[in-house]
Swiss-Prot record:
A lipid is attached at C315 (S-palmitoyl cysteine). One of its GO terms (biological process) is adenylate cyclase-activating G protein-coupled receptor signaling pathway. Residues 64-72, 141-163, 212-240, 301-317 are cytoplasmic. It comes from Canis lupus familiaris (Dog). This is Melanocyte-stimulating hormone receptor. Residues 1-37, 94-118, 184-191, 267-279 are extracellular. Belongs to the G-protein coupled receptor 1 family. It is found in: Cell membrane. Glycans are attached at N15, N29.
Length: 317
């Protein structure tokens, strides 16, 4: 990965400089403090990646199979699944190639490995950018469906949805190519971090506004039924819990990776920041975990999609 600076995973494997058997340890810097390093076993990383691949393939297959799901909202969810699928596939592919090179089962020259690493990095970066974009697109779509309910179908049409989807994919490919080509430039890392913060703020503002509108609607219903306190309190707690889970998972899974990028700009040589850099594979694992969780948050809550998913699974057997 280019995000590790000179410690590229595939090239490190080729040169025999990859880390030893992963474990949970305290690593001591020569000039700094003892660092808590959480190394992820390759078997666990590959297993999580494969689980994510299966989940997101099923989501895409279910949406493709059921015509009732051929709407802008489900297309955005399907594209999020494709992005998460690419995140998992590219990381699993990189790890698998790394293990093959380490075991001597795959003989390759440094130049070939360099090109392969660049291609994989472009795919990983592009899939991450598109995943964040589609998370934002889903938030915007839900916002429009609540605040512009009567005009929603005239605002969010299929042609507009497809144009937005196409623009996201094109922008993701172009930006990832530029990011990988100029990853040594501070501006590139700052752009990536700023993009993450912008998506986080966008999602937080939209979902908080939606929660406020939903609570206002619940109060109106409660007044009509003369059960204002109990209904409003119960709905408020449920809505706040849902919002906390949604934004919390997003921040916990993506935040450490972008903290890593931020520290690469702010303190690349500081010993304490070096402790954070040592846990890069943990941050990638958290992103894979996000790819596993996303279908449960955005896709599997739909009864129609769950029914179609069951049909897809039964047909595959």
């Amino acid at each position: 990965m280019v995000w590790q600076g000179p410690q590229r995973r595939l090239l490190g494997s080729l040169n025999g400089t990859s880390p030893a058997t992963p474990h949970f340890e305290l690593a001591a810097n020569q000039t700094g403090p003892r660092c808590l390093e959480v190394s992820i076993p390759n078997g666990l990383f590959l297993s999580l990646g494969l689980v994510s691949v299966v989940e997101n393939v099923l989501v895409v297959a279910a949406i493709a199979k059921n015509r009732n799901l051929h709407s802008p909202m489900y297309y955005f969810i399907g594209c999020l699944a494709v992005s998460d699928l690419l995140v998992s596939v590219t990381n699993v592919l990189e790890t698998a190639v790394m293990l093959l090179v380490e075991a001597g089962a795959l003989a390759a020259q440094a130049a070939v490995v360099q090109q392969l690493d660049d291609i994989i990095d472009v795919l990983i970066c592009g899939s991450m950018v598109s995943s964040l974009c589609f998370l934002g697109a889903i938030a915007v779509d839900r916002y429009l469906s609540i605040f512009y309910a009567l005009r929603y179908h005239s605002i969010v049409t299929l042609p507009r949805a497809w144009r937005a989807i196409s623009a996201i994919w094109v922008a993701s490919v172009l930006s990832s190519t530029l990011f990988i080509a100029y990853y040594n430039h501070t501006a590139v890392l700052l752009c990536l971090v700023s993009f993450f913060v912008a998506m986080l703020v966008l999602m937080a503002v939209l979902y908080v506004h939606m929660l406020a509108r939903a609570r206002q609607h619940a109060r109106g219903i409660a007044r009509l039924r003369k059960r204002q306190h109990s209904v409003h309190q119960g709905f408020g707690l449920k809505g706040a819990a849902t919002l906390t889970i949604l934004l919390g998972i997003f921040f916990l899974c993506w935040g450490p990776f972008f903290l890593h990028l931020s520290l690469m700009v702010l303190c690349p040589q500081h010993p304490i920041c070096g402790c954070v850099f040592q846990n890069f594979n943990l941050f990638l694992t958290l992103i894979i975990c996000n790819s596993i969780i996303d279908p449960f948050i955005y896709a599997f809550r739909s009864q129609e999609l769950r029914k179609t998913l069951q049909e897809v699974v039964l047909c595959s057997w």
